[in-house]
Amino acid sequence: MLKNINPTHTQAWKDLTAHYEDAQDLQLSDLFANDSERFNKFSATFGSDILLDYSKNLITEETLTKLFALAEQTELKAAIAEMFSGEKINKTEDRAVLHSALRNRSNTPVVVDGEDVMPKVNAVLEKMKAFTARIVDGDWKGYTGQEITDVVNVGIGGSDLGPYMVSEALVPYKTRLNMHFVSNVDGTHIAETLKDLNPETTLFLIASKTFTTQETMTNAHSARDWFLATAQDQAHVAKHFAALSTNVGSVSEFGIDTDNMFEFWDWVGGRYSLCSAIGLSICLSIGFDNFVELLDGAHEMDQHFAQAPLEENLPVILALIGIWYNNFHGAESEAILPYDQYLHRFAAYFQQGNMESNGKCVDRGGNPVDYQTGPIIWGEPGTNGQHAFYQLIHQGTKLIPCDFIAPSISHNPLTDHHPKLMANFFAQTEALAFGKTKEQVEAEFVAAGKTLDEVKDLVPFKVFDGNRPTNSILIKQVTPKVLGSLMALYEQKIFTQGVIWNIFSFDQWGVELGKQLANQILPELNDADSIAGHDSSTNGLINAYKQWRK
């Protein structure tokens, strides 16, 4: 069981607090000027495909030593071992946390409640493989005998964001199938998705563990209604719907053949589920062999995380640097900035992964925390972000540590597009780190033929303070295997931070209250009667809605 250790009570935390008093004045320009080996000392590779450069951070070797001590004193190593061994570290739900078992390519036993789960994991993978082959090869026919051309994944949260992110990231590996993802209960989402589809050639994947998720089942019933408006026979549903669920009764009642139900288990958290049956849409999108490559990459990073010394452990290094900014520098957010258009949903995926996992205010002892936990995660692809929010990162008043991610090899090497993209990738971290001094700005004006008197009022606006921290993650190319490793890198970073912050990262009770209130309000919207049972604001909003919808 995870220990209940308040990190602020450790000697390492006290040492870091004292160290920050000296380190807050660190200048990246000085750190690089004083150490020609800084890049070599503060960078690491993973295999031959991933390079992590963390040299442009406001850290010294002393900083890292104290951060590693914090990891030791909060018993991170023991926590890692407990997670991988199947201990029920999700205490509030009495569950193990074993998304690592889903991609356990070594096939070594993983025991939960006395049972090795790997035979079940492998059985579902084999079932996914066979199903994928039938659909992709065209052997599976719809009710009119035509091949499936379009697949619609109906889910929300972890049943949508992960598969959608991966399917978009790996479009270069696309099968002949067209993938669509519906998540929002707003009817516009499914209506627009179905507008151009043919019921005779469309397959729906209904992704809901319980088969009761409000948004997913609302969309599922609308999808079935749309299908039956053409098919006219409930029996045809079985050829056009599959379920990613564990609720056999509800799946069968819906009309889905339970042979086409793909199970997963309570030790698979939603936001960590894309390597489970929830990844069936990924299999159909990129082919089963490429899905296995994704699992391989994730497994290799899992093994690295479980076995590497803390000082060489990439997820741990990223996590500790994040804690340095979050808890000592007072940074409130982190930006994830992929310089690859295929990764356009990567930041959104880990926005969910991080904020739902570590957005907690109660520690493992049930007490309110008196320190900062999870940061706000956000980001967009480069170079779009440069023309949107980089102004604030460069010259704003907030400290925003950034992760820059880019591939050396593009899947679309059109003329000089990729060199221009990469030039921006390299330039941004250099600009953020070193900025531009008043003297440099003045020299540029003089070189352009201006006098200092002419530009003296403009100069302050063109100065860049620099000293803005970044990590650079350079990958060889966005492949299934590399994406799997990158995904696991961030997952295990999140886990590491949760351990150190003494919180439970694998529940999400914060989403429940809104659901409960929505279920109470829904019946109140069925008539035109005025509502008075809530606070004045909610009453006023509901009553205005009722008036306007007439």
UniProtKB/Swiss-Prot annotation:
<dbReference type="GO" id="GO:0051156">
    <property type="term" value="P:glucose 6-phosphate metabolic process"/>
</dbReference>
<protein>
    <recommendedName>
        <fullName>Glucose-6-phosphate isomerase</fullName>
        <ecNumber>5.3.1.9</ecNumber>
    </recommendedName>
</protein>
<dbReference type="InterPro" id="IPR018189">
    <property type="entry name" value="Phosphoglucose_isomerase_CS"/>
</dbReference>
<dbReference type="GO" id="GO:0006094">
    <property type="term" value="P:gluconeogenesis"/>
</dbReference>
<feature type="active site">
    <location>
        <position position="515"/>
    </location>
</feature>
<dbReference type="InterPro" id="IPR023096">
    <property type="entry name" value="G6P_Isomerase_C"/>
</dbReference>
<dbReference type="InterPro" id="IPR046348">
    <property type="entry name" value="SIS_dom_sf"/>
</dbReference>
<dbReference type="InterPro" id="IPR035482">
    <property type="entry name" value="SIS_PGI_2"/>
</dbReference>
<dbReference type="GO" id="GO:0004347">
    <property type="term" value="F:glucose-6-phosphate isomerase activity"/>
</dbReference>
<comment type="pathway">
    <text>Carbohydrate biosynthesis; gluconeogenesis.</text>
</comment>
<keyword id="KW-0312">Gluconeogenesis</keyword>
<dbReference type="GO" id="GO:0005829">
    <property type="term" value="C:cytosol"/>
</dbReference>
<feature type="active site" description="Proton donor">
    <location>
        <position position="356"/>
    </location>
</feature>
<comment type="similarity">
    <text>Belongs to the GPI family.</text>
</comment>
<dbReference type="GO" id="GO:0097367">
    <property type="term" value="F:carbohydrate derivative binding"/>
</dbReference>
<keyword id="KW-0963">Cytoplasm</keyword>
<keyword id="KW-0324">Glycolysis</keyword>
<dbReference type="InterPro" id="IPR035476">
    <property type="entry name" value="SIS_PGI_1"/>
</dbReference>
<comment type="function">
    <text>Catalyzes the reversible isomerization of glucose-6-phosphate to fructose-6-phosphate.</text>
</comment>
<dbReference type="Pfam" id="PF00342">
    <property type="entry name" value="PGI"/>
</dbReference>
<dbReference type="InterPro" id="IPR001672">
    <property type="entry name" value="G6P_Isomerase"/>
</dbReference>
<comment type="pathway">
    <text>Carbohydrate degradation; glycolysis; D-glyceraldehyde 3-phosphate and glycerone phosphate from D-glucose: step 2/4.</text>
</comment>
<dbReference type="GO" id="GO:0006096">
    <property type="term" value="P:glycolytic process"/>
</dbReference>
<dbReference type="GO" id="GO:0048029">
    <property type="term" value="F:monosaccharide binding"/>
</dbReference>
<feature type="active site">
    <location>
        <position position="387"/>
    </location>
</feature>
<keyword id="KW-0413">Isomerase</keyword>
